[in-house]
Design a protein with these regions (language model features):
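Glycan-processing catalytic domains of CAZymes
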Residues: 22-420
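Intrinsically disordered, low-complexity segments enriched in small/polar and acidic residues
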Residues: 427-433
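Intrinsically disordered, low-complexity segments enriched in polar/charged small residues
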Residues: 9-10, 33, 427
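Intrinsically disordered, low-complexity proline-rich regions
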Residues: 422-426
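Gram-negative bacterial Sec-dependent N-terminal signal peptides
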Residues: 2-20
Length: 435
């Protein structure tokens, strides 16, 4: 009986591991391409987008009308170049600009007539400004928002709206990406419309907020069966973040500016950043299309390697956000062409050697030296090859190495001479043993 149990457990483990690694090979790449111009109909832009695994594109009512195209036609062209890429349409239900731009006038009108703004106190005109400013005012996404004549609150109505306006008319999309899905509100206001101010730090108010987004995404799933739902998960990894309502609700998301900006979580230390990364990943449902987004200069090759190598310690998709043209286009780095294949070791949580972290893949390994660890030399168990690059040839010179020196806050991809393959799961399970 014990032998049977062990064989079954082994088979299940191998099958699950094999399935997990049957998805996109590493390095996995994404882009958060939401900035103007939204010229996704441009053939050159489509070629850029087709090179990555996951793209998030900004769409609005009437997009493509002037070019006599649709988002569906555009996505079809992108997928004709790369059938394995995944494309999501951007929406936001956290706030709305006042006055609304022409594309959003009808949306604003519905919000106004339904009293779906967050108000200072009761149903007056003191709308609450978003912490992003720029005339964006907060919408009441909570379960406590007023219901319309159809018996729906804003969260439910917005789920229907996003599906009807963007999702279902564009079936080639893989799903919807929703921005600013915070784990708690960022402003005080009369969230339950009882004439009193509710604190953003009140756990009850926070639960209303998350439950509202859960209503929203559940509505999206009902309206868009078979599609995936992504969210901005930038603050989900905070140590005090409560994610009860969000657990398994979204299939991926963006860890926006997790590294590279003055306000990035990286500023709290590499270990904190990685714990943040892992906590967000853990809350997502399969296939976990998480985008680890780095902000910075496209010529800071060491910084890019550090971000990419950190990303590769887990299973997210790496996106580089060029400070010269934020959230537009796809910058390409030599490391992106390194075909690492599937991971042959699990996401890494402990240092391998000299404080340096390592993860193994079929066709290579990735090393990352956390900031504050100082310059380190590590010894490899055999011959590995540096990639042959043109952007930083002093590092990526194609040489064979058995020792590697990494600067502080640096990373590197090394290739194997012979690929290492993952074992296939057993074809059958023996169940006859009884001892």
């Amino acid at each position: 009986m014990m032998t049977r149990k062990l064989l079954i457990a082994l088979a299940v483990t191998l099958a699950a591991t094999s399935a997990a690694h049957a998805a996109d090979a590493f390095p996995r790449l994404g882009t958060y391409a939401i900035a103007s111009p939204h010229n996704y109909y441009d053939a050159d832009y489509q070629k850029q987008l087709a090179k990555v695994n996951v793209s998030i594109l900004n769409i609005y009512p009437g997009w493509g009308t002037g070019q006599k195209t649709t988002m569906d036609a555009t996505v079809k062209k992108i997928k004709a170049i790369n059938p394995n890429t995944h494309v999501f349409a951007y929406v936001i239900g956290e706030s709305l600009q006042i006055p609304a731009t022409s594309a959003w006038v009808d949306f604003e009108s519905t919000v106004n007539s339904s009293n779906w703004w967050l108000y200072g106190t009761g149903l007056d005109t003191s709308k609450v400004l978003s912490d992003f400013g720029k005339a964006y005012y907060i919408l009441n996404i909570t379960t406590q928002a007023k219901k319309n004549s159809s018996g729906k609150n804003f969260a439910q109505w917005f789920g229907d709206y996003a599906a009807a306006q963007f999702g279902n008319p564009n079936p080639s999309l893989d799903g919807i990406y929703t921005d600013n899905v915070f784990w708690k509100p960022r402003r005080d206001g009369d969230w339950n419309m009882d004439g009193k101010i509710d604190s953003q730090n009140d756990p009850t108010v926070q639960a209303w907020y998350r439950a509202g987004y859960r209503q929203y995404v559940d509505t999206l799933r009902k309206d868009m069966p078979g599609k995936l739902q992504l969210a901005n998960v930038a603050d989900w990894g905070q140590s005090n973040a409560v994610l009860t309502e969000y657990k398994g609700a979204f299939n991926g998301g963006v860890l926006e500016h997790i590294i590279g900006s003055s306000w990035s979580v990286e500023g709290q230390g590499w270990a904190v950043m990685m714990a943040h990364y892992r906590k967000a990943m853990d809350a997502l449902a399969a296939p976990k299309y998480a985008i680890f987004e780095q902000f910075g200069s496209a010529t800071d090759y060491q910084g890019m390697r550090y971000g990419l190598a950190s990303c590769l310690m887990d299973d997210a998709y790496y996106a580089f956000n060029n400070s010269a043209h934020q959230n537009y286009g796809v910058d390409w780095f030599d490391e992106y062409d390194a075909k690492l294949g599937a991971a042959v070791s699990k996401p890494q949580t402990a240092a391998w050697q000299q404080g340096v972290y390592r993860r193994d893949f079929e066709n290579g390994i990735v090393l990352v030296n956390p900031k504050g660890n100082g310059q380190r030399e590590v010894t490899l168990e055999g011959d590995f090859f540096k990639i042959k690059g043109t952007q930083d040839p002093k590092v990526n010179d194609g040489s064979t190495v058995r020792k590697v020196t990494l600067k502080d806050r640096d990373g590197i991809i090394l290739l194997r001479a012979k690929p290492v393959k993952r074992p296939a799961p057993p074809a059958a399970i023996t169940t006859t043993a009884s001892n």
